[in-house]
Amino acid sequence: DESIKEMISKWSKQNLIQNLEHVRDGEGEFVDFRGKISNHELTEPINLIGLIDSKKGTIRANHYHPQQEQKCLFTKGQIIEVFQDILNPNSPKITQVVNEGQLSIIKPNVAHTMVFSKDTTFLNLVRGEREHNNYGVTHTIKHIFVDEAEKDLLLSCYKFNCRCCGNKNLKRVVSLGYQ
């Protein structure tokens, strides 16, 4: 029992994400009776914006980008994002929730899958070419690591807010198979 507690404690203190992927809220918000303005600073030029609509209960991605950093600004909905460093054979699968209004930034060579827990709309912001004919060749390489059974398991078991206070910003803890 002590060795398991020690292992869980050690794992819980590791920063497993290591800047592979991170989620940010908008900054410098302005709110009045008309609504809200939220700003997201981008650190590199963007030459392509894709508008993507996805239905609740579906999967997108299951791929990685060998050179491009991908930024996704979620305007509606929610996803469970699953990602893994493909350059590190010991890298665990890591999950996190991305909510409406948040920006997800995914580094090159990070396999990622989006499991849609709600009907979702997001802007895909990239630098570089994204010709559909080059899918699997230059900008996006298929890497299936979340199948339909795993998607269903995530959707049925994932907790999106605290059962006590309703907070949506839950801290990830060690679980079997995921971080």
Give the ranges of each region predicted by the language model:
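Conserved short histidine dyad/triad with adjacent acidic residue
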Residues: 50-68
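Short beta-strand His + acidic residue motifs that chelate non-heme Fe in jelly-roll/DSBH
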Residues: 62, 81-82, 106, 111-117, ...
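Double-stranded beta-helix
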Residues: 7, 19, 23-25, 89-92, ...
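N-terminal juxtadomain amphipathic helix
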Residues: 157-179
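A short, N-terminal "cap"/entry segment at the start of jelly-roll beta-barrel domains
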Residues: 1-47, 61
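Short acidic-glycine-tyrosine-enriched beta hairpin
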Residues: 86-108
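His/acidic/aromatic-lined binding-pocket segments of jelly-roll/cupin-type domains
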Residues: 63, 69-74, 96, 104, ...
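Glycine- and acidic-residue-biased ligand/ion/polar-headgroup-sensing regions
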Residues: 67-86
